[in-house]
């Protein structure tokens, strides 16, 4: 089954990433290589900064667009991974090994279809 692993960040995680970028990316590269070899890696991408985001909602058939950053948000989605593995426990294990789980945190979501 496929699972979406959402990566969260905040101002503190940005500072840590700026400081330890090479070490963190080396961990990511190693884990991605392992998941590729096992056939569990599907895809993943980092996302732009919150000031590049837009929220779109339709009210009375009219799109209402709000530019980021969103004041009410203390954290934001910084990226995602898609893995294809046997169970939610395995997906959770993968998320727990991802460096971002120690920083802003991660969520594991089953994908439908």
Feature map (PLM): residue ranges:
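Conserved, structured core segments of small domains
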Residues: 1-113
């Amino acid at each position: 089954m496929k699972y979406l692993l959402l990566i969260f960040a905040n101002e503190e995680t940005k500072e840590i990433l700026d400081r330890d970028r090479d070490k963190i990316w080396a961990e990511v590269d190693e884990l991605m290589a392992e998941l590729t070899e096992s056939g569990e890696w599907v895809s993943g991408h980092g996302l732009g900064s919150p000031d590049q985001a837009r929220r779109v909602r339709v009210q009375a058939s009219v799109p209402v667009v709000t530019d980021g950053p969103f004041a009410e948000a203390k954290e934001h989605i910084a990226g995602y991974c898609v893995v294809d593995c046997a169970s939610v426990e395995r997906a959770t294990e993968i998320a727990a090994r991802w460096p971002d789980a120690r920083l802003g945190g991660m969520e594991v979501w089953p994908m439908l279809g």
